[in-house]
C-alpha cells in the first residue's frame, strides 16, 4: 500500500490519514529531482510529487529494480518519470546526476535531497571510518547536492534538504554522529536561504521523527528500552505512545509536507526546518 515499503502484513498503524494526491498543492508543469528515491521516504516523496503533477527524476544508488518500480508508479498516476543512478557520497557523480537530469526535460524546478544513512554507537566506540561514512552522505553529500541545485534550478525553484528530529532538541544516547550529521543541515538551510536568494530559490529542510520505512523496526528498537525483545507490532504500539496523536509516522506524512514546500503554497517559507514528528516526546 502507498506509504509502506516493507513486505510484511499491514496493521492499523499503516493506515494513511486522508486521500492521496489532493490538488491543493498542484505541481503541474514542474520537474523534480529526488535523491535516494528508490526506497523509504524518498520513494514516497517521488511518488507524491508525481501524483501532484510533477515530472520526476528518480535517483538511486544501488537498486535499479526498486527505482524502476517508482518510475512505473509515477507514470501510472498520470505523470512522467525517469531513473538515474548516482551515489551522492561521490561529488563527481552528483555533478553528473544534475547534468543528466536537466537534459531529460530541459529544466529543473524542485530538488529534494533525501539520501542518508543511520548510525548508533557510544562516542567512545566511534571509529574515524564510521564518522566519515555518516558525514560523507548525510552532510557532505547534501551540501554538494545543494551546490548543484543552485547551479541548475530555475529561478524561483525549491530546494528541500533532509534533517532529523535528532538534529533538533532530542538528546538520544549513542546517536552523536548521526545527530551531528543532521544538525549541520539546519545551519546549511539558514545560510543557503540567503545565498540562494539571488535566484529566488527557497531553501528549507524537513526533520522527520519515527517514520515507518523498511528500516523502521530495526532502527526504532534502538530508541526503546529493551527494544530488541519486542516484535514488530509491539514496537509499533510503543512508538505510537510518543505522539499525542497515538500513531506512528508514515512516509506519506513527510511527502505531503515536502510537496507543500515545493508548491506555490510554500512560496514564503524560506530558511526553515519543519519538524514532522507528530509532536513526538521520546
UniProtKB/Swiss-Prot annotation:
Function per UniProt: Trihydroxynaphthalene reductase involved the biosynthesis of dihydroxynaphthalene (DHN)-melanin, a bluish-green pigment forming a dark layer in the conidial wall that protects the conidia from UV radiations. The first step of the pathway is the production of the pentaketide 1,3,6,8-tetrahydroxynaphthalene (1,3,6,8-THN or T4HN) by the polyketide synthase PfmaE though condensation of acetyl-CoA with malonyl-CoA. T4HN is not stable and easily oxidizes into the stable form flaviolin. T4HN is also substrate of the hydroxynaphthalene reductase PfmaG to yield scytalone.
Family: Belongs to the short-chain dehydrogenases/reductases (SDR) family.
Active site: 164 (proton donor), 178 (proton donor), 182 (lowers pka of active site tyr)
CDD domains linked to this entry: THN_reductase-like_SDR_c (cd05362)
Transmembrane domains' residue ranges: none
Lineage summary: Eukaryota, Fungi, Dikarya, Ascomycota, Pezizomycotina
Family annotation (InterPro entries): NAD(P)-bd_dom_sf, Sc_DH/Rdtase_CS, SDR_fam
Binding site for NADP(+): 41, 114, 147, 178, 182, 211, 213
GO molecular function per UniProt: oxidoreductase activity, acting on CH-OH group of donors
Key words, A-Z: Melanin biosynthesis, NADP, Oxidoreductase
Superkingdom classification of source: Eukaryota
Protein name: Trihydroxynaphthalene reductase PfmaI
Induction text: Expression is positively regulated by the cluster-specific transcription factor PfmaF.
E.C. designation(s): 1.1.1.-
Any one GO BP annotation for this protein: melanin biosynthetic process
Protein's UniProt keywords contain Cell inner membrane: no
Pathway note: Pigment biosynthesis; melanin biosynthesis
